[in-house]
Amino acid sequence: MEHVPGSFGTSASFALRFGQTIFSAASLIFMCFDFDFYDFTTFCYLAMVMAIVTPWSILLALTDTYSVLVKLLPQELRVLSIVFAGDFVLSFLSLGGACAVASATELLASADGKICDGSLCIQYQVSAALAFLCWFLLLASALFNFWSLPSLYY
């Protein structure tokens, strides 16, 4: 089997997973700095998605680490299909959450500052920006794994 750079079990995949873990955890931390995010559904949605993406990325980063160090992880069609499907679904969930939080924060900030003070809106904007970065890395992982799927059929 030919390894595509960035596909599951490579060092480039580990780098993508490490970035996903950092960005999703940071987005979750910035979202949870304030307890008022429970008042808005979009903020709860992003916190929930990032709470799912973080362990997913950690688990796959550990698997990539094992694969790179031991060089013993076999590439199976079923495993790679599950990883691709998980990355693909989570990438669009995180894109939806990031877009929703970015638009809700902009709406709250434009309401004359009555609802969202300066530092709180900045925290939400940083959380949305980190979620966008996490989405980009998740989509890149999904595309690299999708690219390597056909080589497992032969």
UniProtKB/Swiss-Prot annotation:
Keywords assigned by UniProt, alphabetized: Cell membrane, Membrane, Transmembrane, Transmembrane helix
Keyword Transmembrane helix assigned: yes
All ranges on the Cytoplasmic side of the membrane: 1-17, 63-81, 150-154
Location of the protein in the cell: Cell membrane
Principal location listed in the UniProt entry: membrane
Transferase keyword on record: no
Extracellular side: 39-41, 103-128
Membrane association type: Multi-pass membrane protein
GO cellular component: plasma membrane
A Pfam family per the record: CASP_dom
Regions crossing the membrane: 18-38, 42-62, 82-102, 129-149
UniProt family annotation: Belongs to the Casparian strip membrane proteins (CASP) family.
Assembly and oligomerization: Homodimer and heterodimers.
Name the UniProt record assigns to this protein: CASP-like protein 5C2
Species this protein is from: Arabidopsis thaliana
